[in-house]
C-alpha cells in the first residue's frame, strides 16, 4: 500500500471542554456521531475522549487533503475503537473520489492535549 497523504492535529482539551460547556448538545450533535457520543459519554470524564476524536477527525480530513466541508463533513468521519486502537469509517464515495483504500489513525491524549495522526493509503 502506498501512502497518499498524512495528516496530524493537536488540540487543547480545555478548548473542547469550554466549547461543550458553552454549546452543549448542539455542538456534540454537529460534530460527533451517535456512536461516538455514546462511547465518550460512558467515560468518567468524557472530554478527553471527545478531544481525541475531534483531533482524529481533523487529522483524517488533512490526510484526505480536503479539510472539513468540501468532500467530508464532521459526521462523515466516524472514529470508533476496536481491540487494537481507533478505526475510521468514511462514506464509500470518499474512498473512490480521493483514490484511497484505507485510513490508519492513531490518537493519544494527556492531561492537557489530545493529538492524532492519520495516514491515507492507496
Swiss-Prot record:
Gene Ontology molecular-function annotations? holo-[acyl-carrier-protein] synthase activity; magnesium ion binding
> What EC number(s) would the UniProt record show?
2.7.8.7
Question: Cross-referenced InterPro entries, in alphabetical order?
Answer: 4-PPantetheinyl_Trfase_dom, 4-PPantetheinyl_Trfase_dom_sf, ACPS, Ppantetheine-prot_Trfase_dom
State the needed cofactors, names only. Mg(2+)
Q: What is its main location?
A: cytoplasm
Organism superkingdom: Bacteria
Q: What Gene Ontology cellular component terms go with this record? A: cytoplasm
Which terms under GO biological process does the entry name? Answer: fatty acid biosynthetic process
Sorted keywords for this record are:
Cytoplasm, Fatty acid biosynthesis, Fatty acid metabolism, Lipid biosynthesis, Lipid metabolism, Magnesium, Metal-binding, Transferase
Localization in the cell: Cytoplasm
The reaction(s) annotated as catalysed by this protein in its Swiss-Prot or TrEMBL entry are:
apo-[ACP] + CoA = holo-[ACP] + adenosine 3',5'-bisphosphate + H(+)
Which chain positions lie within coiled-coil regions? none
A Pfam family annotated for this chain is ACPS
Name the positions where Mg(2+) binds. Answer: 9, 58
Q: Give the protein's function.
A: Transfers the 4'-phosphopantetheine moiety from coenzyme A to a Ser of acyl-carrier-protein.
Give the family, as the similarity comment puts it.
Belongs to the P-Pant transferase superfamily. AcpS family.
Name assigned to this protein: Holo-[acyl-carrier-protein] synthase
Amino acid at each position: 500500500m502506498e501512502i497518499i497523504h498524512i495528516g496530524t492535529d493537536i488540540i487543547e482539551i480545555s478548548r473542547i471542554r469550554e466549547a461543550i460547556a458553552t454549546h452543549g448538545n448542539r455542538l456534540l450533535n454537529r460534530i460527533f456521531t451517535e456512536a461516538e457520543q455514546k462511547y465518550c459519554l460512558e467515560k468518567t470524564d468524557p472530554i478527553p475522549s471527545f478531544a481525541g476524536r475531534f483531533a482524529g477527525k481533523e487529522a483524517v480530513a488533512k490526510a484526505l487533503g480536503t479539510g472539513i466541508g468540501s468532500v467530508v463533513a464532521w459526521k462523515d468521519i466516524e472514529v470508533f475503537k476496536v481491540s487494537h486502537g481507533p478505526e475510521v469509517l468514511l462514506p464509500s464515495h470518499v474512498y473512490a473520489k480521493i483514490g484511497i483504500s484505507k485510513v490508519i489513525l492513531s490518537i493519544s491524549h494527556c492531561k492537557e492535549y489530545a493529538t492524532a495522526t492519520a495516514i491515507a493509503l492507496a
